[in-house]
Amino acid sequence: MDDQLRQSALDFHQFPVPGKIQVSPTKPLATQRDLALAYSPGVAAPCLEIEKDPLAAYKYTARGNLVAVISNGTAVLGLGNIGALAGKPVMEGKGVLFKKFAGIDVFDIEVDELDPDKFINVVAALEPTFGGINLEDIKAPECFYIEQKLRERMNIPVFHDDQHGTAIISTAAILNGLRVVEKNLSDVRMVVSGAGAAAIACMNLLVALGMQKHNIVVCDSKGVIYKDREPNMAETKAAYAVEDDGKRTLDDVIDGADIFLGCSGPKVLTPEMVKKMARAPMILALANPEPEILPPLAKSVREDAIICTGRSDYPNQVNNVLCFPFIFRGALDVGATAINEEMKLAAVHAIAELAHAEQSEVVASAYGDQDLSFGPDYIIPKPFDPRLIVKIAPAVAKAAMDSGVATRPIEDFDAYVDKLTEFVYKTNLFMKPIFSQARADAKRVVLAEGEEARVLHATQELITLGLAKPILIGRPSVIEMRIQKLGLQIKAGVDFEIVNNESDPRFKEYWSEYYAIMKRRGITQEQAQKAVISNTTVIGAIMVHRGEADALICGTVGDYHEHFSVVQEIFGYRDGVHTAGAMNALLLPSGNTFIADTYVNDDPTPEQLAEITVMAAETVRRFGIEPKVALLSHSNFGSSKSAAACKMRQTLELVRERAPELMIDGEMHGDAALVESIRNERMPDSPLKGSANVLIMPNVEAARISYNLLRVSSSEGVTVGPVLMGVAKPVHVLTPIASVRRIVNMVALAVVEAQTQPL
């Protein structure tokens, strides 16, 4: 580690507060009543319920989502036996990973005890606190004994990640690697360097899946492990001891090996050894920070080799974060009493299968130009793949149920998967009613920027979820090339249609129709022809206008108002409406908030604001939410006579005439809109109850400023929109920062709007 990295790491751990974790309350503690419920006397009620039924602890406490990361510091991350206290930063780091990737809370516990039996007694006594135990950085062979005894004594999952996490990921990699080179697990020969916890667990798991034990040769620091090599050999080693054939070194046994599994130290495997391996060898060089052989060195003598390491700077990283958060997620969610072989194997297969799936846009963004299509350089998923939790946790949970170790079986697996998806995509629950309705009658949606990577990823999602029938505008050769480069599994003409923006036989009809619409607005025939050829939003809008598509999504490239101008000119406003407006939804920890008008009208009149307010309320109801509207101003219920304040008061009168059933009040300050007690101090008889969820701003400046401040200030907040309201056809103009998920969400909303369009 160089000095700069060392200092950066020290600063990272020290500032702004020491360490990486904290405890945050999940219940309010703002009033005397809150304290009475959280502690004495109210806390007695759940205590008595748990006394009657111990399983009630999962209902009334955090036990069901709490894991202990426990270590004695005897084998810390390549640092060796540095002691329990010195290992604490690692254990805190493990806790951060549990929380980040699976939403699991962690207490890190460092036990200053080297005697295995005493250590076991300490850990076993902690069972009432936790839903699971993650043993970490405990040296072999004691780790095997400790885990086995704790599994026997405890009625919650006990999992030594250094063993089983590495084994699960390595096994998934080997299964996929053998698939790439067309070899069978039962036929291949494997040489192993290292006989510690990870190596033994890897071999055990591979044998459980069908690798033949007689095809495995293990080398430790003394050389080949053969029968009767030494008296009192550890049972874990003896299980893999081979007959003595005179071979003593790694170099002696590597000849013809299909797989090298390294869980030992740097530079153990030489290029000369790699040369002697079988056709298309697999090399898992997992020592950290320096592997048994560096991939470029191995590739220099064997281009056909498939190589995995524990490092992030090479392809095929064997990283335990691919496994442990999600195997615990599945185990906790069914109240598993153990993590058994069936659950581990389920995780292996789920991880292996995910590598065959199309590329995730999150992974593509994180790893730049790397080719992440299944093949020699991509046989296991990347740690940042958001689908890991959705694939692995349900597989593990189901295996726990099928093998009889689940105390709280999941009754509705579809609902469970939806819940896990919400962890990945925070908009999932919010969009659920829209998605359900869109799936019922998928419509043709034209995406104007069809060559964009985000649009292509969104198209994959739309097909996978069954939300729409996409039509992409773009050059077919470019679209096909980018689909292949992005590792997507969609096909033009099968999953979606392409409209070639450079040459389409319908273009003469398109520009003629566009000219007919625009000829009295200063557009010549020549300009109409040029617009159709050069502007994909014009093409998409004309397609919807002609009935060749049901809805349009545009704006992922370019200026919002340029796109809006096109759709407004071609479609006009819907019946009974004389303006358009844009609304953004913010999904915040405190609740969902809708803000309008965020894009269209710079300084709307009272009449325009009234129309926007009514349309906003209609749109909010599509999400299954009852709108509570506040008209915002610097004025609070008549405190100012300014023109801006009067505008909002006039808006209130107009809205009450047009939508008397709508819960609305104003004009008011922002804090009064969100906090009922503040509002009641000024207007105790306000018809607006609770916190307002629809905020109508006096102008676009106030709307955009408020939206962006809320969006950025809440690190956990996510957005949906902008939702375009008032245009005669289902169309939404997005912005260049739109994510793949935002595109998917807006397509689904456009489909639902198209379903209700008059024929």
Model-derived regions, located:
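NAD(P)-binding Rossmann-fold cofactor-contacting core
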Residues: 193, 209-237
